Amino acid sequence: MVKKALAALGIVLVLQSLFALCLVSAMQLLVLRNTPFGVTGASPVVNAVTSKVSLETLAYADESAVMEAIGQSKLHGAYLPGQASDTLIVVPAKSFFGRVEIEAAFGDAAKKLERPLTVKTVKPLPEYDRLGGVSGLLLIPLLIGGYLAAVLLLKATRTAAAPWHVAMLVGYATVGAVLTDLIAGPGIGAYTNDHFWPLLPCFILIAASVALAAAAFQRLIGPLGTLEVATLFIIVGGSAAGGVGISLLPDYWQHIGAVFPPQHAITLVRNVIYFDGNSITTPLIVLGLYALGGGVIVGYLGRRRPVKMVGAPAPAVAPVRLTRLTRLTQSKPRSHSPRARRHSSGSSSRWRSPRSCSACSPSTT
C-alpha cells in the first residue's frame, strides 16, 4: 500500500515538473517570433525594426491588398511607406501583446529616423475583451470538460470502449457547448449575441474532439491512456495553445502546438469572433480528424473486439465451492433422522458398524 502511494505521488511530481517546464518555457518571454507582417515598399524604418524584432515581411501591392490579408487573419500588421509620411497598421485582435510590441518598435525607429508616422488600428478589441483573452479562456472549460467526460465515463461504466460511448460523448459535447455558449455569451457578455450560433458548432467540435480522442487513448493504451491524454492535451498542448498569440511562442512551441487540438481550438474561436470566420479551414480539419479518429477507434474496437473492463470485480470462486460442498453434503444419508435409525435397527443382522464388530474390538479378557 505504501509503495503504491509513493508511486502515485511520484507520478504527480513528474507531471507537475513537466507542466512547469512546458508552461514557463512557452510563456516566459512573450516576444514576437517569425511574425507575418505586410509591407508595400522598402523603408529604412522597416529595416531598422526587423534587425531587432523577428518579423516575416510579406510584400503586397497596395493598401487594399494588405487590408484583405488582414481580414483573412494572415497578418499581425503592415507598414505602408509614403512620400511625406508613413502608415503603420496594427491588428490588436490578432494579438494584443503583439500589437504593443509592434507599435513600440516602429514608433521608436520612426522617431530616430525622423520619419512622420501615423498609426492605424484595424480589428480593434472591444471593451468587454480588452486583452483578447476570451478565446483562450473559452478553451479551458471545453478542454477540461472533454477530458473529464471521457475519464468519468470510463470510471462509471468500467468500459474502455463501446459503440454507445461515441453517442454519449457527442451528446455530452453538445450539451456542454450549449451551456458554455449561454454562460459566456448572453450570460456574461464575453462576446456579442450574434456570435452565439456561429460559435456553438465550434464549441461542440472542440469538446467532442478532446473527449473522443481521450476515450480512444484509453481504449488503445488502457488505464494509462488517461494519464497520456492529460500529458499531451493539457500539459503539452495547453502550454502551446497560444492564447496570447501564437507568434509570441518560441518557434519549437509553435510547431509542437500545431499537432494538438488546443492551438487550433483557440485559432478557430478567435477567427470566428474577430475575423468573420475566415482562415478556419485548418483548425476545422485538425479538430475534425481528432473527433473522427477517436470515434472510429472507440466504436469499431468496442464492437469488433472484447471490451476491456477496468476495475471489474473478481469472479466469485468461493460461492461455487460452497455450492459444490453443499451438494456433496446433501447427497450423504442422514443417519440421525428417525427413518435412518429405524432402517439401521431393522437391518442389524445383516450390517454392523465397525465399532460393534467383535473381531475388530479389543479383547476384554
Where are these regions (language model features)?
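Transmembrane alpha-helical segments that form the functional core of multipass membrane systems
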Residues: 134-242
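Extracytoplasmic loops/domains of multi-pass membrane proteins
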Residues: 43, 50-124
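Membrane-helix interface and discontinuous TM-entry motifs in multi-pass inner-membrane proteins
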Residues: 76, 112-151
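A local structural motif
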Residues: 34, 50-59, 191-192, 196
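Membrane-spanning alpha-helical segments of multipass transporters and channels
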Residues: 198-324, 339-341
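N-terminal export and membrane-targeting signals
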Residues: 1-12, 131-138, 156-170, 194-198, ...
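Hydrophobic alpha-helical transmembrane segments of multi-pass membrane transport/permease proteins
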Residues: 2-32, 139-149, 234-238, 290, ...
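Cationic, amphipathic, low-complexity alpha-helical segments enriched
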Residues: 326-329, 334, 338-342, 350-355, ...
